[in-house]
Amino acid sequence: MAILIPASFGRLTITSRAQVRVRVSASANQRTIRRDSVDWVKETSSFFEEDKRPIMLFDGVCNLCNGGVKFVRDHDRNRSIRFEALQSEAGKKLLLRSGRAPDDISSVVLVENDRSYIKSEAVLKIMKYIDLPFPQLAFFLQFAPLFVRDFLYENVANNRYAMFGRSDSCEL
């Protein structure tokens, strides 16, 4: 008999009850570790106390990402987005707040006071904050299926250094 675990556990096929017990207890231990760890929302709440603007986390050594930051700054007349490199201490803390590993530089992240967005969702959310016509473009792009948007995003993100190069340090 095979038991299929839900997708959130990574589609494992389990062939015996002993394996099920091991998996459940391992999962329970992970929850305990998370509960006892630092509350990163509280730890980073100071980032949003005086300034409620969202923070765009980006790869500080990626030329494509630096170009994206420059583009957003040029098209954000209201200065509604703040920027932080993923490699900075503040960036690492905000990654932890978002439920991501502190060394994960695989995606742009948009951190709002109560929510975080990654990959194509982050890009669309950023587009909603900047000047016309980008909010309207984001509205239409949101109807493309998430798996298609993220597939395209991941293909560019995984090849960004090869296509656009990298710099020695963050330009901001």
From Swiss-Prot:
It holds the Pfam family DCC1-like. The keyword S-adenosyl-L-methionine does not apply. Keywords: Chloroplast, Plastid, Transit peptide. Residues 1-25 form a transit peptide. One of its GO terms (molecular function) is protein-disulfide reductase activity. It is found in: Plastid, Chloroplast. Disulfide bonds: none annotated. Signal peptide: none annotated. Its main location: plastid. Coiled coil: none annotated. The keyword Plastid applies. InterPro entries: DCC1-like, DCC_oxidoreductase. GO terms for cellular component: plastoglobule. Belongs to the DCC thiol-disulfide oxidoreductase family. This is DCC family protein At1g52590, chloroplastic.
